[in-house]
Regions:
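Alpha-helical recognition segments enriched in aromatics with Gly/Pro capping
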Residues: 1-24, 41, 112-320
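N-terminal, positively charged nucleic-acid-binding surface of large information/translation enzymes
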Residues: 2-7, 11-97, 433, 437
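Short, polar/flexible loop-turn hinges at active-site or ligand-entry regions and domain interfaces
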Residues: 74-80, 101, 294-298
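N-terminal, positively charged, Ser/Thr/Ala/Gly-biased leader segments
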Residues: 91-127
Length: 444
């Protein structure tokens, strides 16, 4: 499978179908997990900036060994564990300015579909039952590891460390589980092979194809999912449908601490829940955007502080009065340059460079309402939006002043006040009942 940059050609003109692997909901997400969520939210936002209609699906894995183990530790049900950490996830990513997905499917909602999917693979000869488990025949899948650029020999070597009991149930050590027989005391569902639950990989294949169809435009996730998760998704999905599963694969880089990957297994992680106690959500999000999504980023106190300083500069730029005239061609040149930067594999680092160039241009005296909204639109691609520090009582006072000016036929002053409020994102509506106002953007 090519790792070269390719022009994006959607399945359907003007529309994008994206599936991004979401969290296994057994704990709070850490900063590394958040990078993936933010990266793909930014990619989605950029497609929308370019006027695409985006169907964005990101799942919750709510059936997993880790959830079962956490339920035992906390003395609650796996369902209660999943509900608890889904709520925590939503709270954390909202603080990071992440938009809700078009749909957040949960595995438990698709159990019948998963069973039918596995049955179909068995009928086609791609899967087999063994002692209540069902496994996928890797040898039958042509170009099985094309995504990860691995050979079957590599996989067989990697499988050598598995237990004899596990290997004994398989035709080949590299075969992977589609369905797992239930263990005593574990949550399970009835199936043609006895009570059990789905394997990890089958879940995303089923949710993606059921919601978005057999072939999607983009499938994304963290770099650690390339193998085996995404590799296995491709194998089982294409075996079932006979079609390409995803036309484009995108993987975000890791967040490192002291140049070592942040992970729960290494114990060097910081949860978003804790990070937000000392770091503003927009600052953390802006920090992520300073590096290309596919490259590692080092999480340091200095890097976060620099992000905070730079974000403050952009906020100060945005909050000045945007009155005056500008050269429309110069404004268009910045917009074109921004698109060129982001079109190159969603290069947020280069996109932000253009935003700062535009900020310096604005601060040199080039500002009006059109510039303000163009600037705000670029920032919103990165999920950066600012609160307008305009108090309701101040707006009302200006409206009263404008009404007096109109009554005195001082239309120049009335127009000036209208323009002043528009630069602050406030639109005036003159009605028979009087003047009302509304915000042009809800900035947060």
């Amino acid at each position: 499978m090519s790792r070269d940059l390719r022009d994006f050609v959607p399945i359907e003109d003007g529309k994008v179908k994206m599936y991004v692997c979401g969290p296994t909901v057994y704990n709070y997400i850490h900063v590394g997990n958040a990078r993936s969520t933010v990266a793909f939210d930014t990619i989605r936002r950029y497609f929308e900036y370019r006027s695409y209609e985006v169907a964005y699906i990101s799942n919750f894995t709510d059936v997993d060994d880790k959830i079962i183990n956490r339920a035992k530790e906390e003395g609650i049900t796996p369902q209660e564990v999943a509900d608890k950490y889904i709520a925590a996830f939503r709270e954390d990513v909202t603080a990071l300015g992440v938009q809700p997905a078009t749909r957040h499917p949960r595995v438990v909602e698709f159990m019948d579909d998963i069973i039918r999917f596995v049955e179909d693979l068995i009928e086609k000869g791609y899967a087999y039952e063994s002692q209540g488990d069902v496994y996928f025949r890797v040898e039958k899948s042509h170009n099985y590891a094309k995504l990860a650029n691995k050979t079957l020999e590599d996989l067989e070597l990697g499988a050598s460390g598995r237990t004899d009991e596990e290997t004994a149930r398989k035709e080949n050590p590299v075969d992977f589980a589609l369905w797992k027989a239930a263990k005593p005391g574990e949550i399970s569902w009835e199936s043609p092979w006895g009570p059990g639950r789905p394997g990890w990989h089958i879940e995303c294949s089923v949710m993606s194809t059921e919601i978005l169809g057999d072939t999607i435009d983009i499938h994304g996730g963290g770099a650690d999912l390339e193998f085996p998760h995404h590799t296995n998704e491709i194998a089982q999905s294409e075996a079932k449908t006979g079609k390409t599963f995803a036309n484009y694969w995108m993987h975000n880089g890791f967040v490192n601490i002291d140049n070592v990957k942040m992970s729960k297994s290494l114990g060097n992680f910081i949860t978003v829940h804790d990070a937000l106690k000392t770091i503003d959500g927009q600052v953390l999000r802006f920090f992520f955007a300073t590096q290309h999504y596919s490259k590692p980023i080092n999480f340091t106190e200095k890097a976060v502080r620099d992000a905070e300083i730079n974000l403050k500069y952009l906020k100060n730029t945005y909050e000045q009065p945007f009155t005056g005239t500008v050269d429309v061609k110069e404004l268009q040149a910045f917009q074109d340059k921004f698109v060129a930067a982001m079109d190159e594999d969603f290069n947020t680092a280069n996109g932000i460079t253009v935003v700062f160039e535009m900020a310096r241009w604005i601060n040199s005296g080039n500002y009006n309402v059109e510039v303000k909204y163009a600037f705000a639109s670029m920032l919103e691609v990165f999920g950066i939006v600012f609160v307008e520090e305009v108090l309701d009582k101040e707006i009302e006072a200006l409206i009263q002043k404008r009404q007096k000016a109109r009554a005195n036929r001082d239309f120049a002053t009335a127009d000036k006040i209208r323009e002043q409020l528009e630069t602050q994102g406030i639109k005036l509506l003159d009605t028979k009942e009087g003047t009302r106002w509304q915000r042009l953007h809800k900035l947060k």
